[in-house]
Swiss-Prot record:
MF (Gene Ontology): microtubule binding
Provenance organism: Arabidopsis thaliana
The protein's role, per its UniProt record: Microtubule-associated protein (MAP) that regulates the orientation of interphase cortical microtubules.
Keyword Transcription regulation included in the entry's annotation: no
Gene encoding the protein: WDL2
Annotated Pfam families: TPX2 (PF06886)
Localization, UniProt: Cytoplasm, Cytoskeleton
Name under which the protein is recorded: Protein WVD2-like 2
């Protein structure tokens, strides 16, 4: 039985070594999460085995080899009851029993323990990690290992040479200062030119105003000559003879001969144009003018004859008309001839 167990232990150890060797060879490749977890579980189990070996060495001195054999048997039987995922944790007591048997043999056990110590450079844990916390620790160790590996690969030492820093802002400040100085000079020159132009314009305006005042100063006499002269002589107005309208005859109509004689006697020396309606009056006047005049007695006799032929109403009317005959005054009112 002891030989078979040793053979089994060696086979498992060889498998574990091959797995570890393959894992180390594949470190350069990107490990998958399943392979990383398996490798971390193996490392934890190996660390636990080393701790168990040290503890069993101290106990193996006092115990006999028969007691080790009796302790190995129930652990071998317990192998069948343990589920497959926890095979690594079940193999721990089995390996411890095989190591105790090898302690009885002597040199073989020391050589195997030395090889294990040489393979594992990590410090020995004094406390066993519980199974329910193992997965969290594996994740933490995987993250730390991956971060350390990437940091080691990415870190490359560079040689830096001490050089004084050169800032572009200093050159910009100098250029800006020069620009502002030039701008201020231009502004000052423009202001000075503006002032000179204003002064020149004022002087020109003053000269123009003085010249205008000289030209506008008139030397006038105190009293003009036309005030001393008298008014011009007035020309006499020409007075034209005024015509007056003839009043209508409202009495009975006379015969043609009577009207002609009456009008001729009343108005002497008048133009016959005023009596246009009497055509025979002008002819009679011509005849009378052609006949030589007799003394006043003949004219009086004619007047008497004419008065006898006219009624009294006609006489009143003739007197009224004779009152309006004559020259008109300044206001156009007729003056009665005396």
């Amino acid at each position: 039985m002891g030989r078979e167990l040793v053979d089994k232990h060696m086979d498992k150890k060889a498998n574990s070594l091959t797995a570890s060797s393959t894992g180390s060879s594949d470190d350069n490749k990107v490990p998958s999460p399943s392979t990383n977890e398996a490798a971390e579980v193996k490392e934890c189990t190996e660390q636990n085995l080393v701790a168990d070996d040290a503890r069993l060495r101290q106990q193996g001195i006092t115990e006999t080899p028969g007691s080790h054999k009796s302790s190995v048997k129930p652990r071998v039987t317990a192998k069948t009851t343990v589920p497959k995922p926890f095979s690594l944790s079940a193999e721990k007591p089995r390996r411890a029993a095989v190591d105790n048997n090898s302690l009885g043999n002597g040199a073989s056990h020391n050589s195997s323990s030395a090889s294990r110590v040489s393979q594992l450079n990590s410090p020995l844990p004094t406390r066993r990690i519980p199974d329910h916390k193992m997965h969290h620790d594996e994740e933490d160790s995987f993250s730390v290992a991956s971060s350390s590996a990437t940091s080691i690969r990415s870190f490359k030492p560079k040689i830096t040479i001490g050089v004084a820093p050169t800032f572009s802002s200093t050159s910009r400040l100098e250029r800006r200062r020069e620009f502002y100085q030039k701008l201020e000079e231009k502004q000052k020159a423009l202001e000075a030119e503006k002032r000179e132009n204003e002064k020149r314009l004022k002087e020109e305006q003053e000269a123009v105003t003085k010249q205008l005042r000289k030209n506008m100063a008139y030397k006038a006499n105190p009293v003009p000559s036309f005030y001393q002269e008298g008014p011009p002589p007035k020309q006499p107005l020409k007075k034209f003879p005024l015509t007056r309208p003839k009043s209508p005859n409202l009495n009975r109509r006379k015969s043609c001969s009577d009207t002609v004689n009456a009008s001729y006697q009343e108005v002497k020396g008048k133009h016959c144009a005023r009596h246009r309606h009497s055509v025979g009056g002008c002819k009679d006047e011509v005849k009378t003018n052609s006949v030589p005049r007799t003394p006043n007695s003949s004219s009086k006799d004619q007047m008497r004859k004419s008065k006898k032929g006219t009624p009294k109403s006609e006489e009143v009317h003739e007197m009224f008309n004779s009152g309006h005959d004559g020259e008109t005054g300044e206001n156009g009112v007729g003056v009665v001839e005396e």
